[in-house]
C-alpha cells in the first residue's frame, strides 16, 4: 500500500457557530449530507459537530487534490462512525470517481476538537 493522497484542515468552531447563527439550517445543509443532517438536528452542540464535518470534508478534498471545486462538493463526503465510534469517510459522486482514478483502496480519517478548533486529517491509500 502507498499513500496517494493526504489532506489536513482546521476549522475555528466559533466562526462556524456564527455562520450557523446567521444562515441557520441552510448553512448546515450546504455542508452536511442527508444522513449527517439527521444527526445534526438532534444535537445540542451543532456548531462543534458542523466544524468537525467541515474540516473533514475539506481535508478529504485536499487529499483528492481538488479542494471543494472541479465538480467535487461537500455532499460527496459523508462522515460516519463505526460501532466503536471511530470516524470513517464515505465517498460518493465526483469524489468517488476521482478516488477510483487515483487507485484509492483505503481511506483513513482522524478528527479532533478542542475548545476553539476542530482539525481533521485524511489519508488515501492505494
UniProtKB/Swiss-Prot annotation:
EC number: 2.7.8.7
Cofactor: Mg(2+)
Record field: catalytic activity: apo-[ACP] + CoA = holo-[ACP] + adenosine 3',5'-bisphosphate + H(+)
Coiled coil: none
GO molecular-function terms, A-Z: holo-[acyl-carrier-protein] synthase activity; magnesium ion binding
Cross-referenced InterPro entries: 4-PPantetheinyl_Trfase_dom, 4-PPantetheinyl_Trfase_dom_sf, ACPS, P-Pant_transferase_sf, Ppantetheine-prot_Trfase_dom
Source species, domain of life: Bacteria
GO BP annotations, alphabetical order: fatty acid biosynthetic process; lysine biosynthetic process via aminoadipic acid
Role of this protein: Transfers the 4'-phosphopantetheine moiety from coenzyme A to a Ser of acyl-carrier-protein.
Protein name as catalogued: Holo-[acyl-carrier-protein] synthase
Origin species: Vibrio vulnificus (strain CMCP6)
Designated gene of the protein: acpS
Amino acid at each position: 500500500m502507498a499513500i496517494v493522497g493526504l489532506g489536513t484542515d482546521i476549522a475555528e468552531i466559533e466562526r462556524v457557530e456564527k455562520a450557523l447563527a446567521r444562515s441557520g439550517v441552510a448553512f448546515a445543509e450546504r455542508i452536511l449530507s442527508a444522513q449527517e443532517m439527521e444527526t445534526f438536528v438532534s444535537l445540542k452542540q451543532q456548531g462543534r459537530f458542523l466544524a468537525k464535518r467541515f474540516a473533514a470534508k475539506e481535508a478529504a478534498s485536499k487529499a483528492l487534490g481538488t479542494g471543494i471545486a472541479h465538480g467535487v462538493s461537500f455532499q460527496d463526503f459523508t462522515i460516519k462512525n463505526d460501532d466503536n465510534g471511530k470516524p470513517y469517510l464515505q465517498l460518493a459522486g465526483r469524489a468517488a470517481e476521482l478516488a477510483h482514478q487515483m487507485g484509492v483502496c483505503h481511506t483513513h480519517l482522524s478528527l479532533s476538537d478542542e475548545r476553539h478548533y476542530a482539525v481533521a486529517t485524511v489519508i488515501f491509500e492505494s
